[in-house]
């Protein structure tokens, strides 16, 4: 498919455009409030990252939300970067990932055209509600992005492999 600017659009370019739009739009408030955290949740996340403890007891593995820390702890411990700076970078990256998920869901599950899916991703990225949720709740943003990428796998539930893959992705 050709765009009005003469660029041929593919799914990989659509994902890249959606990720870039989400990243840039979510990065603006982080840059404006640079040395300070935007949300009070960021202080909570930074505390756990600095403490280095995800689970106080092994049983909290099943009752706590640890997936965000699973991605951020190794980066924080190996690079030694400040936890607030890492969270200021992780927020826009996670929002870009979620915007990509909206595009992928519209393209794969709903069967929309490339232009319509790009519009859905662009519309999601400028909504104030989605921007607000992504600034406060990084764990929810990660979970929503993973859900949007996992839902198109439901179409492949006719095979055992597809069922197992979608259940693993959703759990």
Name what the model sees in each region.
Residues 145-149, 154, 166:
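A compositional/structural signature marking long, glycine- and acidic/polar-rich segments
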Residues 12, 109, 150-159:
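Structural signal for the C-terminal ends of transmembrane alpha-helices
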Residues 4, 19-20, 118, 154-158:
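Short, motif-level signal for alpha-helix interfacial/capping segments enriched in acidic residues
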Residues 3-6, 112, 162:
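Compositionally biased, low-complexity segments enriched in small residues
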Residues 161-171:
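Membrane-interface alpha helices of multi-pass inner-membrane proteins
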């Amino acid at each position: 498919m050709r765009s009005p600017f003469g660029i041929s659009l593919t799914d990989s370019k659509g994902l890249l455009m959606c990720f870039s739009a989400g990243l840039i739009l979510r990065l603006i408030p982080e840059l404006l409030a640079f040395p300070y955290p935007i949300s009070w949740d960021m202080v909570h996340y930074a505390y756990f990252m600095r403490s280095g403890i995800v689970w106080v007891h092994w049983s909290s593995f099943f009752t706590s939300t640890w997936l965000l820390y699973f991605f951020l702890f190794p980066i924080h411990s190996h690079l030694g970067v400040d936890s607030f700076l890492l969270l200021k970078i992780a927020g826009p990256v996670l929002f870009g990932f979620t915007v990509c998920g909206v595009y992928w869901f519209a393209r794969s599950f709903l069967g929309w055209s490339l232009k319509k899916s790009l519009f859905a991703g662009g519309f999601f990225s400028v909504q104030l509600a989605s921007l607000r949720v992504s600034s406060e709740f990084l764990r929810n943003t990660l979970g929503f992005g993973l859900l949007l990428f996992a839902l198109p796998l439901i179409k492949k539930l006719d095979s055992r492999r597809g069922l197992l893959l979608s259940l693993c992705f959703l759990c």
